[in-house]
Every structure is written in C-alpha cells, then in structure tokens.
Amino acid sequence: MSETVVVRVKPGSRKGPLVETADDGTLTIYVQERAVDGKANAAVTKLLAAHLGVPPSRVELASGATARLKRFRIS
C-alpha cells in the first residue's frame, strides 16, 4: 500500500534543510540546493525520507518534477 504526500518546495533557501508542517497537513521543505539538473528534487527526496523515517528508495516523485508543489508516493 502506498501513501501520497503533498510537499511545497523552497529551493535555494538559506533556511534549509528544514521541514515545516502547515495546519492543512501540507509539508514545506526548504533546501539549499538550487532547482538545477534535479538537485533540489534529490535533496527533497532525501530530506522527506528522513523526516518520515523511511529509506529514500521508498520515496518516489509522483508529480510536479518542475513545479514547487509536488506529490510524493511513499511505498
């Protein structure tokens, strides 16, 4: 069974790496990596996996590869 997590990404942030949870359950993830060549997506995947306590191999980007609002599938 898989779960979907909605994430708002803030790439190139001086605040990161950091995960914040909004009242509606949406996660905001701040990463220092810029959104170039998938570096920010890779950093978000690793940080989200650590936040959820699962291996990074179980976290898959479902949609939003080039958007700031992303959906990740956790298997």
Curated annotation (Swiss-Prot):
InterPro entries: DUF167, YggU-like_sf
Superkingdom: Bacteria
Recorded family membership: Belongs to the UPF0235 family.
Annotated NCBIfam families: DUF167 family protein
Name of the protein in question: UPF0235 protein MSMEG_3845
Species this chain originates from: Mycolicibacterium smegmatis (strain ATCC 700084 / mc(2)155)
